[in-house]
Amino acid sequence: MTNELVYEGKAKRLFKTEEAGVLRVAYKDDATALNGVRKESFAGKGELNNQITSLIFSHLAGAGIESHFIRAISETEQLVKEVSIIPLEVVVRNVMAGSLAKRLGKEEGELIPNAIVEFYYKDDALDDPFINDDHVLYLELATTSEMDIIRQAARSINKVLQELFNQMNITLIDFKLEFGRDATGNILLADEISPDTCRLWDKETNQKLDKDVFRRNIGNLTDVYTEVLNRLKQVQN
């Protein structure tokens, strides 16, 4: 196992492996908000997100959705296919919340009949601005056909995840996806799917089961992440 660091982000480190085209992802215990301005560490967070992401990506694979995920190799690590990340954050929204509610002057919790798919330019220096397809083409981030693939994949993933979280008695409010190109140019789902990247509300109480408890100082982050993992394990058994 090599320790040559390829990339370090807010929540993960990526390392080379002895196998060409395969990387090792190590999940960190750090939590950030306000695009990294606020940062704290929570013991066990990396382990929780690694397990949750591994289970969800495996579930998506069973539904025919390709991703970079290969397998988990430890409590905090997984192997993934090396991809070139497309600098787009793809956000799928099922219920009004967060920045969308503020932008449109709507109340949080209002159901969106047909899920909204949004794109944000992944650039910390610019604070990840909201962009549309024309901006994507102008910036040469992706082609028209790639955008079609990404948008369709996002909607397919949303359908599978909504069904999964419904079984967990959780409402999938919204979530962020990232995609990358493999060595042959195929578009694959990448990054992670966890309470770091999703808004999750308990169906009965509307209790927030995601990173909003950290952003808004309304609960214990590791407690709610553990609750999500436990519910996920129950429906996967």
Swiss-Prot record:
Pathway: Purine metabolism; IMP biosynthesis via de novo pathway; 5-amino-1-(5-phospho-D-ribosyl)imidazole-4-carboxamide from 5-amino-1-(5-phospho-D-ribosyl)imidazole-4-carboxylate: step 1/2. It catalyses: 5-amino-1-(5-phospho-D-ribosyl)imidazole-4-carboxylate + L-aspartate + ATP = (2S)-2-[5-amino-1-(5-phospho-beta-D-ribosyl)imidazole-4-carboxamido]succinate + ADP + phosphate + 2 H(+). GO terms for biological process: 'de novo' IMP biosynthetic process; cobalamin biosynthetic process. Pfam families: SAICAR_synt. InterPro entries: SAICAR_synt/ADE2_N, SAICAR_synt_PurC, SAICAR_synth, SAICAR_synthetase, SAICAR_synthetase_CS. Keywords: ATP-binding, Ligase, Nucleotide-binding, Purine biosynthesis. The keyword Repeat does not apply. GO terms for molecular function: ATP binding; phosphoribosylaminoimidazolesuccinocarboxamide synthase activity. Its EC number is 6.3.2.6. The keyword NADP does not apply. Belongs to the SAICAR synthetase family. This is Phosphoribosylaminoimidazole-succinocarboxamide synthase. It comes from Listeria monocytogenes serotype 4b (strain CLIP80459). The gene is purC.
